């Protein structure tokens, strides 16, 4: 069993992996980003930091989406959503619903996109978790979503 210092150190290393992964996304080095996020996920799993694990899994889904691997993206989103349900994190559910909505929209499946957008809005509106940590997560998701949108515009 990990002591508090080891757990804290492992969480910090996972956070640093994620920061570098986001930088890799900006540089369009998606393979490196996937590797780094998977390393961060393995570290978080070992510490039992479930909520952050689910947040990072959601981000991995975004990176897969950038790479046009919708199947892997949805696997990540659905596992993240299931975890959010278990830990009762409305803010995390809102983020995942938003990403699923965006995916469906890009596929031209507007009815599903609208449903998940409404779910995201409802979850976020009723969330009591509007903390600084949640805000930082939203900023990171927004940043990567812009990268996805920029890529789709460039491909059009």
Describe the role of every protein-language-model region:
Residues 2-3, 39-43, 79-85, 89, ...:
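Amphipathic alpha-helical segments of tetratricopeptide repeats
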Residues 15, 55, 95, 134-140:
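Residue register of alpha-helical TPR repeats
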Residues 24, 44, 64, 84, ...:
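Eukaryotic all-alpha helical interaction scaffolds
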């Amino acid at each position: 069993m990990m002591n508090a210092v080891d757990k804290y150190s492992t969480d910090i290393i996972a956070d640093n992996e994620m920061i570098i992964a986001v930088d890799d996304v900006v540089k369009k080095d998606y393979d490196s980003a996937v590797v780094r996020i998977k390393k961060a996920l393995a570290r978080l799993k070992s510490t039992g930091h479930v909520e952050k694990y689910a947040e990072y899994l959601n981000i991995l889904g975004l990176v897969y989406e950038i790479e046009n691997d919708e199947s892997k993206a949805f696997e990540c989103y659905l596992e993240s959503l299931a975890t959010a349900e278990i830990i009762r994190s409305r803010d995390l559910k809102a983020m995942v619903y938003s990403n699923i909505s965006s995916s469906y929209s890009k596929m031209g499946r507007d009815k599903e996109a609208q449903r998940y957008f409404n779910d995201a809005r409802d979850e976020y509106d009723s969330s009591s978790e509007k903390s600084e940590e949640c805000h930082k997560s939203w900023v990171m998701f927004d940043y990567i979503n812009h990268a996805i949108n920029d890529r789709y515009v460039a491909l059009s």
